[in-house]
């Protein structure tokens, strides 16, 4: 019999520690000016075609064999279970003439593959997800069917949160502003935005966001996913065409489907394929009538969180102008984290924001808040305020969240604590480049561009993914592992999320343990063609040499293939 109390996630009270220690746990102090890097604008220069490293054939073969063995064992377990343990498989069996909730085929991956490693996903945490994060300890005695919680926690170095600029803090100017807003406005504004839910704080924060991204106006949403999922149907219909990058986020896909627009996809970041597709669609027109499309909109992301790659914005703007299309850029992961002043991909490439028709972003990641925004010309935003369902029926962004957004924006621009925003931007730029180049030199395969704060490191075999996650947790390091269907079947990976809250010494500690675990799991399979090689040989640098030389080398673009 399962005890309810043993499976309930416990409520852990805040730690009673000195204030200075608390601040240090949430945001590490800079130990040297050498550990800063000023990101540079590319002045309209396009990205080169990426050079992707690939493992030897035997690595791919072993990965496929891993899946084959798991699938065979899973089917054997299903046969034995459905034959001898029917009471444990009621959800996939017919009961009293009712069809099963799930078929054995559609639920196979979840039951027989994912459940084996469920302890690596959705780990509950408590407290502020800053430089360190408190993970609730849990155990399972029945292959992750359920977990029990002993009531203890582990303080782990945080490489798992989208806390890019380190604004996830319980002390400081942002927290003070949020508390003051709560005292003045409360936690709820009383109704949807078009009824009585708009306060002066909403208007002011939308103005700040628009000014920050370089647009005339902006509209805020209380949920990032809902921003994309709800706004496409305001200006698209079945006579419009959306040309979408194949790796666009599911929120974009959901929104486009709800709009009823036709959709065509092009290979990720392949500008030749995109241009060919645009030309074909202009010639062919609508599928049945072959009349010209009412409008064609190209949808891309600024920074792709599973790949660490960036949209080739200069080429996209060139194609948009050449073929008279609209351009939509989702800056969920790039706004605040990329560019010399943190203004995203336009800032990174040195391209005027006026060249982007519609800009979307989330406020959860770089700003430590919640929700999303759409920024565009004022007449477009005015139309969205009338047409979208969210302002009429959805809940507005709470006042404390608005205060967090406004104060973090003011910190980045220097209106509050001049110099602090630039330090945060320079710290995340250095940390991202240092960790990426160090991993390459150690012999790991990593994807993405040099300045990306998201660093995917390939693990390949499904058995190595939970092993890596568990071994890092034992070393008090919290990481996120990702597998199919979020990635290709044989390209499971760990995704390191770099933060300005981390110190150089934190990354040294991380590298030492990654190096140790990588040797034990045989993860060093890089050929060196994507970077990190030494004297033309596959990179297998000594960890001491990496820590000694890489902090200086990572500031030199010649060490990166960009």
Swiss-Prot record:
Q: Which UniProt keywords apply?
A: Acyltransferase, Lipid metabolism, Membrane, Pyridoxal phosphate, Sphingolipid metabolism, Transferase, Transmembrane, Transmembrane helix
Q: Name one GO molecular function term.
A: pyridoxal phosphate binding
Query: Where are the N6-(pyridoxal phosphate)lysine modifications?
Result: 365
Query: What domain of life does the native source organism fall in?
Result: Eukaryota
Q: Where in the cell is it found?
A: Membrane
Which reaction is the catalytic activity of this chain?
Answer: L-serine + hexadecanoyl-CoA + H(+) = 3-oxosphinganine + CO2 + CoA
Q: What is its EC number?
A: 2.3.1.50
Record pathway: Lipid metabolism; sphingolipid metabolism
List the InterPro entries hit by this protein, alphabetically: Aminotrans_II_pyridoxalP_BS (IPR001917), Aminotransferase_I/II_large (IPR004839), AON_synthase_class-II (IPR050087), PyrdxlP-dep_Trfase (IPR015424), PyrdxlP-dep_Trfase_major (IPR015421), PyrdxlP-dep_Trfase_small (IPR015422)
PROSITE patterns associated with the record = AA_TRANSFER_CLASS_2
Membrane disposition: Single-pass membrane protein
The cellular component terms of Gene Ontology attached to this UniProt record, alphabetical and capped at eight, are: membrane; serine palmitoyltransferase complex
Q: Which family does it belong to?
A: Belongs to the class-II pyridoxal-phosphate-dependent aminotransferase family.
Task: Please identify the protein, giving its name as recorded.
Answer: Serine palmitoyltransferase 2
In its UniProt entry, the species of origin is given as Kluyveromyces lactis (strain ATCC 8585 / CBS 2359 / DSM 70799 / NBRC 1267 / NRRL Y-1140 / WM37) (Yeast)
Gene coding for it: LCB2
């Amino acid at each position: 019999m399962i005890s309810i109390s043993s499976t309930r996630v416990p409520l852990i009270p805040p730690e009673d520690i000195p204030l200075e220690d608390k601040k240090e746990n949430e945001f590490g102090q800079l130990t040297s000016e050498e550990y800063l890097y000023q990101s540079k604008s590319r002045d309209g220069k396009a990205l080169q075609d990426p050079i992707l490293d690939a493992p030897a054939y035997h690595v791919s073969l072993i990965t496929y064999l891993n899946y084959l063995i798991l699938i065979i064992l899973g089917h054997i377990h299903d046969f034995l279970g459905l034959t001898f343990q029917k009471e444990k498989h009621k959800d996939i069996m017919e009961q009293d003439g009712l069809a099963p909730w799930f078929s054995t085929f559609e639920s196979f991956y979840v039951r027989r593959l994912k459940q084996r490693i469920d302890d690596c996903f959705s780990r509950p945490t408590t407290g502020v997800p800053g430089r360190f994060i408190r993970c609730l300890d849990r155990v399972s005695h029945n292959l992750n069917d359920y977990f029990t919680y002993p009531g203890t926690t582990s303080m782990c170095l945080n490489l798992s949160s989208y806390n890019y600029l380190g604004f996830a803090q319980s002390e400081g100017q942002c927290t003070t502003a949020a508390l003051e807003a709560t005292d003045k406005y409360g936690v709820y504004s009383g109704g949807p935005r078009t009824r009585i839910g708009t306060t002066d704080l909403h208007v002011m924060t939308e103005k700040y966001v628009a000014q920050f991204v370089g647009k005339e106006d902006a509209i805020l949403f209380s949920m990032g996913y809902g921003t994309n999922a709800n706004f496409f149907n305001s200006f698209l219909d079945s006579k419009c065409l959306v040309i979408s990058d194949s790796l666009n986020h599911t929120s974009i896909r959901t929104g486009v489907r709800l709009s009823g627009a036709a959709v065509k996809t092009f290979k990720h970041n392949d500008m030749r394929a995109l241009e060919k597709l645009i030309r074909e669609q202009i010639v062919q027109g609508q599928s049945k009538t072959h009349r010209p499309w009412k409008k064609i909109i190209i949808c891309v992301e600024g920074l792709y969180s599973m790949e660490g790659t960036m949209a080739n914005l200069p080429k996209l703007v060139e194609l948009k102008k050449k073929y008279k299309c609209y351009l939509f850029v989702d800056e969920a992961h790039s706004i605040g984290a990329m560019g010399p002043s943190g203004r995203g991909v336009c800032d990174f490439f040195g391209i005027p924001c006026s060249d982007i028709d519609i800009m979307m972003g989330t406020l959860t990641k770089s700003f430590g808040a919640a929700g999303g925004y759409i920024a565009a010309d004022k007449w477009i935003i005015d139309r969205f305020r009338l047409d979208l369902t969210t302002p009429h029926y959805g809940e507005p962004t709470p006042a404390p969240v608005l205060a967090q957004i406004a104060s973090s924006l003011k910190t980045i621009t220097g209106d509050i604590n001049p110099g602090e925003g630039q330090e945060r931007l320079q710290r995340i730029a250095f940390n991202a480049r240092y960790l990426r180049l160090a991993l390459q030199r150690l012999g790991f395969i990593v994807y993405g561009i040099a300045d990306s704060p998201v660093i995917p490191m390939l693990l390949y075999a499904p058995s190595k993914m939970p092993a890596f996650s568990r071994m890092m947790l034992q070393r008090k390091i919290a990481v996120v592992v990702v597998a199919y269907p979020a990635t290709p079947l044989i390209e499971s990976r760990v995704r390191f999320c770099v933060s300005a809250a981390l110190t150089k010494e934190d990354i040294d500690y991380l590298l030492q343990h990654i190096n140790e675990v990588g040797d034990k799991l045989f993860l060093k399979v890089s050929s060196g063609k994507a970077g990190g090689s030494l004297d033309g040989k596959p990179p297998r640098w000594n960890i001491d040499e990496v820590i000694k030389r890489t902090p200086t080398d990572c500031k030199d673009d010649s060490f990166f293939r960009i």
